[in-house]
């Protein structure tokens, strides 16, 4: 079973409270989502492998550490996942970015794929799949299904808020995928929204209704 981790760093929790507030405007919401994503990426990337290299410092040769192994690709689930990309790129600027477009049927709550655009070397990269919310788990499962069909195998899922039923569904569908969240909330309401949650993260990021 993949790892499940709530990243409860004080700065992340403080910033998450800011964007939970219903009167948080679009500008602040967007900025703080990016900040949380950057802070989370520090923990998500903690197990990236290192190797020794010999470099020349001003004082002579020295053996130091550098990243090795698979390079990173960030895969936002459209559209809300886009809001987390720039924050991670601040920390890992060389990462490539792909996109998986899904929409949720408001009646059945089932996801439907409408767009996929990925780096050509997706199979050789460590993927960070990002979406602010892990609710029913349907969108995350479908996105990861799509990535695996295209050769991806090293996948981490990163969200801001999750609920137990979404975590359980994703773990059952993809037990090899590590899940990282800033908060594990109480439940889903009858409309499939997380409570207390953030509301509709996409609408709040882009100022739409």
UniProtKB/Swiss-Prot annotation:
Cofactor descriptive note: Binds 1 Mg(2+) ion per subunit. The magnesium is bound as Mg-PRPP.
InterPro entries: PRibTrfase_dom (IPR000836), PRTase-like (IPR029057), Upp_B (IPR034332), UPRTase/APRTase (IPR050054), Ura_phspho_trans (IPR005765)
Residues that bind uracil: 194, 199-201
Keywords: Allosteric enzyme, Glycosyltransferase, GTP-binding, Magnesium, Nucleotide-binding, Transferase
Catalytic reactions on record: UMP + diphosphate = 5-phospho-alpha-D-ribose 1-diphosphate + uracil
Protein EC: 2.4.2.9
Function: Catalyzes the conversion of uracil and 5-phospho-alpha-D-ribose 1-diphosphate (PRPP) to UMP and diphosphate.
Protein's name in the database: Uracil phosphoribosyltransferase
């Amino acid at each position: 079973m993949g790892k499940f981790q709530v990243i409860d760093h004080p700065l992340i929790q403080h910033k998450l409270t800011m964007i939970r507030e219903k009167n948080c405007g679009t500008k602040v919401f967007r900025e703080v989502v990016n900040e949380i994503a950057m802070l989370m990426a520090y923990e998500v990337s903690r197990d990236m492998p290192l190797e020794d290299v010999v470099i020349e410092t001003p004082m002579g040769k020295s053996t130091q550490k550098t990243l090795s192994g698979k390079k990173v690709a960030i895969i936002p689930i459209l559209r809300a996942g886009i809001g987390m990309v720039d924050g991670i790129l601040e920390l890992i600027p060389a990462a490539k970015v792909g996109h998986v477009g899904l929409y949720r049927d408001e009646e059945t709550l089932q996801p439907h794929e409408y767009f996929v655009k990925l780096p050509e070397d997706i199979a050789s990269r460590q993927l960070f799949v990002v979406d602010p919310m892990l609710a029913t788990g349907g969108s995350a499962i479908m996105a990861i299904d799509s990535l695996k069909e295209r050769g991806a195998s090293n996948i981490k899922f990163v969200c801001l808020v999750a609920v137990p039923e979404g975590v359980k569904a994703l773990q059952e569908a993809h037990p090899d995928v590590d899940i990282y969240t800033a908060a594990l909330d109480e439940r889903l309401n009858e409309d499939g929204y997380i409570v207390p949650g953030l509301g509709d993260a996409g609408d709040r990021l882009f100022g739409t209704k």
